[in-house]
């Protein structure tokens, strides 16, 4: 377990916490440690990654570039935080490692905004 935010690089961020889904990077927030997944794994193999980082999914994926390109893990990422994630996340993942198949699933519970991108490589 790591007490750190998922991000593209190892750094410090300012995070404004809020009730439920209200957390976000904000200069007026509390200073928190941020880590990239590549840094945490330090080259170790990973077979599955789940991202749901309240709109920072692309930043977290950028911090997993080596792991994705080297090991092609199964990936599940939230898509409902930012409208453009429906396009940018699959394109970015595909740019890191060709051969992924992409699936979108809308969960059947209330509230109905739990839309996820599933990425499965053909290896």
Which residues does each PLM region occupy?
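Phosphate/nucleotide-binding beta-alpha loop and adjacent structural elements of enzyme active sites
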Residues: 1-123
